[in-house]
Amino acid sequence: VQTCALPISLDLKLAEVYAAAEKKAVNERPPFLRAEQRGWIKGRNDCWKSKDVSACVEDSYRRRIVELQTLYRLVEASGPFWFVCNGEPANEVVVTYFRTDPSTLIAERGDQMSLMFQQPAASGTYFQGRNESFREHQGEVLVEWGWGAPTMRCVRKP
């Protein structure tokens, strides 16, 4: 994929963020960062299949920058916040919000983790991960964890 039309600022920003992530990942075992970056490059290169190649490439860069900022805690965060779901204290979701563009959160449930991106919502806030979602509206929190899973009603712990 040609990245010539890509704003140089995105390429420079990714290089800066990747370098910061490398510093934090120095003791990772096994080393995931480089492998993930190679996978990201392959995905970005698949943008040639897209109807709008430049939009695909730009979105790919923006998402990768945010993923690195979030997963390696390179930006300001608020939380963690604990939520009890379906009235069961053992059914807990822990959420940390990150000041990224777009906004993100990491939700943890048991030994699973989901990076979610903020999506447009008519009201309240809505975050979507691969197979998970987190919706806050007027004090009510709805979480879906896993493809086709039932919606859980959650309450933030004081």
Model-derived regions: residue spans:
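A generic short alpha-helical patch detector that favors 3-5-residue windows
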Residues: 9-10, 32
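Alpha-helical transition-metal enzyme core signature, strongest for iron centers
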Residues: 11, 36-40, 44, 61
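Cysteine-centric segments in proteins
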Residues: 18, 62, 66-158
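Alpha-helical segment that forms one wall of the substrate-binding/catalytic cleft
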Residues: 11-21
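Surface-exposed, polar/charged faces of alpha-helical domains
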Residues: 23-38, 42, 49-55
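Short, small-residue-biased leader/transition segments that mark boundaries at the very start
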Residues: 3-6
